[in-house]
Curated annotation (Swiss-Prot):
NCBIfam families tied to this protein: efp, PRK00529.1
Species: Thioalkalivibrio sulfidiphilus (strain HL-EbGR7)
Protein name (record): Elongation factor P
Localization, UniProt: Cytoplasm
UniProtKB keywords: Cytoplasm, Elongation factor, Hydroxylation, Protein biosynthesis
Molecular function per GO: translation elongation factor activity
Pfam families: EFP, EFP_N, Elong-fact-P_C
UniProt cross-references to Gene3D superfamilies, sorted A to Z: 2.30.30.30, Nucleic acid-binding proteins
Amino acid sequence: MANYSTSEFKSGLKILMDGDPYAIIENEFVKPGKGQAFNRVKVRNLKTGRVLEKTFKSGDSVEAADVMDTNMQYLYTDGEFWHFMVPDTFEQHAAGEAAVADAIKWLKEQDMCVVTLWNGVPLAVSPPNFVELTITQCDPGVRGDTAQGGTKPATLETGAVVKVPLFVEEGEKVRVDTRTGEYVSRV
């Protein structure tokens, strides 16, 4: 298994601590006036999502986590698990609710997304940055309601609620940024 020295730490690096995979969020190199230099690191546990702050002496090394980001196709949900498939090998993986988390409201069947695997177990699911979804329910926008451009809430086919401009109607397809949850454009 590969090891990373503290000099190789950077955001996004996946490391193994106490038997759990962690992703480095922030890394700060500190050289005090007196004493040994150290790295102050903020890490997120990929299994639980908890964020911790750890310090490593300069020159320490940590084990690399065997974490892979894989492009997979979302197939279906059986109520308890969300099932994904690798398109090339047709290998299927079932992810629990903790792994899918907020991605639930952006996923529709046959969509491609990135699944983070650790020892063959899905840890996290990342939807594509932009998704195109149909509006299933929204109030009609009445002309003259506002002086400037206003917005109204709209429910999408996946159940997510997004604020859309008044001119967007029920049944239309809209593009949504999944990172912010905001309306981008009509399709």
